[in-house]
Amino acid sequence: MLSASRLTIANLRIAQPRVAAIRTRKHCAALPGLSLSGRRWFSRKAHDSAKVAPPACPPPPPSEKSNTPYIIGAIALTAGGLGLAYKLGLFDSDPVLEQSSSLGIKASKKSKSPFPPSSKDLPKEVPYLLIGGGTASFAAFRAIKGHDAKAKVLVISNEPEMPYMRPPLSKELWFNPEEKAQLEPLKFRQWNGVERSIYYEPEDFYIDPRQLLDAPNGGVAIARGYEVQRIDVVNRKAILTDGTEISYGECLLATGARPKNLPAFEAASLAVKEYTTLFKSVNDFEELSEKLKAGSKVAIIGGGFLGSELACALSKFSEIREKNLEIYQLFHEEGNMGKVLPEYLSYWTTDRVREEGVKVWPKTQVKAAEVQDKKLRLTLTDDSSLVVDHAIIAVGSEPNTDLAKTSNLEVDPKLGGFVVDAELRARSHLYVAGDAACFYDPKLGRRRVEHHDHAVVSGRLAGENMAGKNKPYTHQSMFWSDLGPRIGYEAIGLVDSSLPTVAVFAKVDPPEVIPDTSEKLQAANATVIPASATAPSSAGAKASVLNHPGIVKAEEKLAAAAKKEEENDDFNKGVIFYLRDEKVVGVVLWNIFNRIGTARKIIAQHTHYDDLNEVAKLFNLHDRPEETEAE
């Protein structure tokens, strides 16, 4: 816990929400202990939520017999079995099954055909049906099997992939050297230095959908490349796009979210689409990796989590692979993570992203796109243009609720997502988890969350309830992000820059106190500094209390002066409290790790704190994390 003298060295900031309209033209995580180009990356820390451990290694194969007659007999039996399997068509499965072999060799092309090849091969009735093949579904079927060991679970996914984790797609996978990427393109190093695949389980964990109903011990089958068109809730049936009906006992909708597009690209020609990527899936990652040739110019459109993470990751990718890429990041906010972070911290973050080699263009929007001379020309709203080789659109996502209209399910008009009750039920025997669920939070009101931790926890709880547990969803989910070597943060609750914030940052060298007559301070809309804040501490340090420039000024000179003042600050480590009705509803832990449980308790108390400076002591701002060397 911080001593009183240490606390006065902290820099306290109070921010009010900005209210001005946005003007035109004016991103698992980094790898702790991994040295890249002489710099140590500290970031991905122990995840707060329960994690599913990777599967245990299979037992060693039995020793070979040296008896020649037995070997000859075995060869004959094997040949006969292979011949029978060929006649039965068991070798007609989708080639995607071989793409993540134990050797990690990348397949040249992935088949887009469904598996099994025909919907006639799918079970006509299953006890548990999960629609969607992402993290929420994975957590759900693990929970179901945990409570019903012989459960028979069918997962229907519209992707040609087994369930996999998405966070590494914008982070760790880009840090692999060329030779490793060629052999093991979908493996990454975790925060603890251990390497693993993005796939949650190896393929032999799953059972063939055609064998599911006959399996004496049950199992989980993944039907890939199929789409559910409608749910008959009354009769408990899922109807596929080709009319195939599958009856279920319990059903989960884990349809996730899909990436948003921009009008300029939606209205563009088909040729433009060849030069753009709506980044979301492993297929997007692989295609983008192939398109990033040496010397390419890449525009990333979007300043939120995905856009900022990709910008930093691609810059590091360029350095590791010696690609000499030019990375541009364009967004309409005034700084990176502008919808999440207080404005002063957003400005500071933008400067750190630029230090990573990214050319950041804030307050910029694209109004048109066209292909010229095999290049993509982006016309901006101020009529200037940017010519690049490829554009990545990362402007957020929207819940996939297509089933709502065809199945008469309720969607929240403001937040989107299927409306569910406390047990994550949308209707009887029909549950929703992950990005597509709009649930009620007793402390924060109705919410919809698009983060990995929420997908894991909501999927697990939905699976338990499908197995008969009837538990309410009370978890306050967290999320994390890493932007280069200097920024790694965890957050929980309502984290929105439109809310008032109070931040406490640790300062190694105490800043000079800015008197309340300072022109710069006035330009920043500073509050009067209380005497207690300017009085010397026992260590001779002082603290400054500022009100960040949340309201956009009418004149650019004032805004520039405020920004210049902010640039002199160093926000390396701190805690930001987000307030609503003077109660803490969200917390960002800025380069502070393994304290998310404390933040969760503060939000759960749902009370007014007279002195958030005292609350900040709970996070031990001056503790130093232990450094561990990479293997």
Spans of features found by a protein language model:
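N-terminal mitochondrial targeting presequence
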Residues: 1-67
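FAD-binding core/adjacent interface of flavoenzyme oxidoreductases
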Residues: 73-80, 84-129, 143, 202-299, ...
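Mid-to-C-terminal Rossmann-like scaffold of FAD/NAD(P)H-dependent oxidoreductases
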Residues: 114-119, 124-127, 436-593
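N-terminal Rossmann-like FAD-binding beta1-loop-alpha1 element of flavoenzymes
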Residues: 126-150, 306-317
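Rossmann-like NAD(P)H-binding beta-loop-alpha module
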Residues: 141, 283, 287-341
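N-terminal Rossmann-like dinucleotide/flavin-binding domain of flavoprotein oxidoreductases
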Residues: 143-245, 341-359
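A Rossmann-like FAD-binding core segment of flavoenzymes
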Residues: 199, 219-230, 235, 246, ...
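FAD-site-proximal beta/loop scaffold in flavoenzymes
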Residues: 271-294, 377, 383-465
